[in-house]
């Protein structure tokens, strides 16, 4: 009994750290999971951009959550392959959890609705300690694509809309920031500004919201705001993805911005989905 699952990356429109409400939009980078059911045990490999990744906490948490949800007792052999860099704010954990939940359910021969799969993945992420808010916004955008605005305190999808596949430039600095390192940080000082950004996104002005969110969180977390300023001067719409350090921009001239941003770090061009 084998199964396959696939889920994508996303970038942040509004980070939920400060208020519990957030939003993200899907981009065209992917994580794939293949599983084989076995009697017991959990073994396998995780490869991220060709490099081995040894942290299996999330895999073990997904297995535990699915066992509880289905009442099935099983082990797995797994193979996870991802295009999404880890610790950059590009929703690698959400994509891995979603893909693995889908793969295990397929192997079990049980159908699962997308929102239920997302909720199980979020539960696993909380169990594994790889999220602060539960990241229901990130997980929704990862699996469903498009723009997803959510209340992470209730795991509730408030709004979803399709987006055009416009170009996205990613700026991916060398350093990584694991979400667990931010636990206990008090974000209340920026909550009023992030509330305004979220309300703006709910009204349909999500591009404006992501710029405000990016500037506020960059200043608060100590990231440079120069990449956003550079993008704005070129007519792009730019923000900080998640906790960073990755930035992203929507632009009609991705090659131009990619060249400008290359002085800050590695860049890639992808698209919304």
Swiss-Prot record:
Pathway: Metabolic intermediate biosynthesis; chorismate biosynthesis; chorismate from D-erythrose 4-phosphate and phosphoenolpyruvate: step 5/7. The keyword Amino-acid biosynthesis applies. It is found in: Cytoplasm. GO terms for cellular component: cytoplasm. Belongs to the GHMP kinase family. Archaeal shikimate kinase subfamily. It catalyses: shikimate + ATP = 3-phosphoshikimate + ADP + H(+). It is an enzyme of class 2 (transferase). Its EC number is 2.7.1.71. This is Shikimate kinase. It comes from Thermococcus gammatolerans (strain DSM 15229 / JCM 11827 / EJ3).
